[in-house]
Regions:
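Alpha-helical bundle segments that constitute or directly flank the non-heme di-iron/ferroxidase center
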Residues: 2-32, 94-117
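Alpha-helical scaffold segments that form or flank carboxylate-/histidine-based iron centers
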Residues: 3-14, 33-53, 92-96, 121-135
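A structural signal for well-ordered alpha-helices, especially hydrophobic packing surfaces
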Residues: 19, 26, 52, 59, ...
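Conserved alpha-helical segments that form or flank metal/cofactor-binding pockets of metalloenzymes
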Residues: 36-73, 140-143
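Carboxylate-rich helix-loop segments that flank metal/cofactor sites and access channels
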Residues: 57-97, 101-107
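Preference for long, well-ordered alpha-helical segments
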Residues: 95, 99-147
């Protein structure tokens, strides 16, 4: 398995976790005490879905078998698991705190991917997405500081 394929599988799993986590957080905040933040989190959920599709499509273009069900390693290290617990409560601060934890995990996964010997085209996509994930984490942290 190529480094591109390994990284793609791990990133797709992380992105799917983020997509689901942001969607759940948006739903919770829409119904809770911070509905104005829901649109931001929904947008980030949609961004993660787009990033996942982009990586899957690129992997297929390179002939890699990007298993869309994810990897065992990624499944064991899901940064968004904390969000599942936080979403059961009503505290917007807890929901955002869990989102930041998930984003810290996503940033870490992108940094691990960038340490691998990736092909030039895949590295360009991963680098661009990494920058967007860092910006998203900062955006969620900014919301958290308002709470």
């Amino acid at each position: 398995m190529s480094d591109d394929e390994k990284a793609a599988k791990e990133l797709v799993e992380t992105l799917r976790d983020g997509e689901k986590g942001f969607a759940a957080a948006a739903e919770k905040l829409r119904d809770g005490d911070r509905p104005e933040w829901a649109s931001t989190l929904q947008r980030l959920s949609e961004q993660r879905a787009q990033f996942s599709r982009e990586i899957i499509d690129l992997g297929h273009a390179y002939g890699d078998d990007v298993d869309e069900s994810g990897t065992a390693t990624a499944a064991m290290h899901r940064g968004w698991i904390a969000l599942k617990d936080a979403v059961t409560g009503d505290d917007a601060g807890a929901v955002l705190g869990a989102a930041v934890t998930g984003e810290d995990h996503a940033v870490s996964e992108y940094e691990k991917a960038l340490e691998k010997d990736l092909s030039a085209g895949f590295r360009e996509v991963v680098s661009r997405q990494h920058q967007a994930v860092v910006a998203a984490r900062d955006e969620v942290k900014a919301l958290q500081s308002v709470d």
